[in-house]
From Swiss-Prot:
Keywords: Cell membrane, Cell wall biogenesis/degradation, Membrane, Teichoic acid biosynthesis, Transferase. SUPFAM superfamilies: UDP-Glycosyltransferase/glycogen phosphorylase. It catalyses: 4-O-[(2R)-glycerylphospho]-N-acetyl-beta-D-mannosaminyl-(1->4)-N-acetyl-alpha-D-glucosaminyl di-trans,octa-cis-undecaprenyl diphosphate + CDP-L-ribitol = 4-O-[1-D-ribitylphospho-(2R)-1-glycerylphospho]-N-acetyl-beta-D-mannosaminyl-(1->4)-N-acetyl-alpha-D-glucosaminyl di-trans,octa-cis-undecaprenyl diphosphate + CMP + H(+). This is Teichoic acid ribitol-phosphate primase. Its EC number is 2.7.8.46. Pathway: Cell wall biogenesis; poly(ribitol phosphate) teichoic acid biosynthesis. Belongs to the CDP-glycerol glycerophosphotransferase family. InterPro entries: Glycerophosphate_synth (IPR007554), TagF_C (IPR043148), TagF_N (IPR043149), Teichoic_Acid_Biosynth (IPR051612). Pfam families: Glyphos_transf (PF04464). GO terms for biological process: cell wall organization; teichoic acid biosynthetic process. Its main location: membrane. The keyword Cell wall biogenesis/degradation applies.
Length: 389
């Protein structure tokens, strides 16, 4: 039934797009920024948008809508996508940050340039065509109906090291993968903003000023909008019993899809700051990062601060998802599979890891100048101003 409905929707979208393309010209001053991940501009989009907005001759259309639960929510989201076809058919540049169904089921106009600015920085966990027929990936049968990640003209990545992996994941040629830098990394070069964030945090939590603040940001375990299993595999109560009296505090930040599955209680050791601070603000505030398989490690490496990898389910994750690199030798920090080992890692002085983090950062984030948003915006503008293919 689901396959039948997908075919119907694909046919309707394709026909509507063809009709719009036949009737309407491409508007060479129009850029569309679209995402199903957020209801507003994300950190990655915001910097690019602000740069583009400086040119008053450009027309910028924002298409943001999350899919709500239930039949009505899905129907409303589908209607939103259908209405978006007008903008897809008339824009010169389409900028995305994730999976975008309408683009994959229409015969994209040659004059339209589709650019994928993937939401994750760097190539870490496998995705796209790298995990076909795996639990987290598309099935071969689905790809016959919906060729996901098709119709991209370019993808933008953080470094040359990521190029072959994104080419594999999107089934693109390497020359189409451009290491211009990831716009949201510009955050770490806005020193005045970071100072303001730190001052405001210490005013809000003066008791934490002299404590060691550990940011816990576990990866989203699931596909689509659905979290699989426990959102916080780390036993925070056990961690508290070991570290609470040693001037540590844990700041929790969860992926939006993970919140309803989280079983945490705030106290003087664990603070869930997901709704209060952005992930990047918490990175700047923190003294160290605890994570597992999150691509946040790329951005965090810019801070040159310790990272601890708590991975009790590593073997299972390798089977279900896998990575583009051998996990143990790739991550720039100690790996633990139980809380006592994690505590030992946190309390140890890992001088060697500081050098590893520096090397990791230089390899996987080439542009460390705070100008990635500008480079991406300039690349987009080159199509909007020239009007050429």
């Amino acid at each position: 039934m689901k396959t039948f409905l997908t075919r119907i929707v694909k046919g309707v979208f394709g026909t509507a797009y063809k009709l719009l393309s036949a009737l309407l010209p491409v508007q060479h001053d129009k850029v569309v920024i679209a995402s199903y991940r957020e209801d507003q501009l994300s950190d990655n989009f915001r910097g690019v948008y602000e740069k583009l907005k400086q040119d008053p001759s450009l027309r910028i259309t924002l298409l943001f809508r999350k899919m709500d639960k239930g039949l009505i929510g899905r129907a409303a989201y589908l209607l939103h996508l259908f209405c978006s076809l007008y903008h897809l058919a008339t824009c010169r540049v389409l900028l995305l940050d994730d999976y975008y169904f309408p683009l994959y089921v229409v015969p994209k106009r040659k004059e339209t340039v589709a650019i994928q600015l993937w939401h994750a920085c760097g190539a870490f966990k496998k995705f796209g065509y790298s995990i076909v027929n795996k639990p987290f990936g598309p099935s071969s049968d689905y790809l016959k109906i919906v060729p996901v990640h098709s119709n991209y003209d370019y993808a933008i990545v953080s470094a040359p090291a990521a190029v072959p992996h994104f080419a594999e994941a999107f089934q693109m040629e390497e020359k189409q993968i451009l290491p211009l830098g990831i716009p949201r990394t510009d955050y770490f070069y806005h020193k005045e903003h970071i100072r303001t964030v730190l001052d405001e945090f210490h005013q809000a939590y003066p008791e934490l000023k002299h404590k060691k603040k550990l940011l816990y940001a576990p990866t989203f375990r699931g596909s689509g909008h659905h979290q699989e299993g426990d959102a916080t595999p780390l036993d925070l109560l056990q961690l508290k019993s070991a570290l609470h009296h040693k001037d540590y505090v844990v700041m929790l930040h969860l992926h939006p899809y993970m919140r309803k599955h989280a079983h945490t209680e705030e106290d003087d050791f664990v603070l869930d700051l997901t709704d209060s601070y952005s992930l990047y603000d918490l990175m700047a505030i923190s003294d160290g990062l605890i994570t597992d398989y999150s691509s946040v490690i790329f951005e965090y490496s810019l801070l040159k601060r310790p990272m601890y990898f708590y991975c009790p389910d590593l073997e299972d994750y390798l089977k279900e998802r896998d990575f583009y690199y051998p996990f143990e030798s790739f991550v720039p920090g100690p790996i633990s599979k139980d809380v006592p080992s994690l505590v030992h890692d946190i309390e140890s002085d890992h001088e060697a890891d500081t050098k590893r983090i520096e090397a990791f950062s230089q390899t996987y984030i080439t542009h460390q100048d705070g100008k990635s948003s500008e480079r991406v915006a300039d690349f987009i503008s080159s199509f909007l101003t020239s009007g050429a293919d």
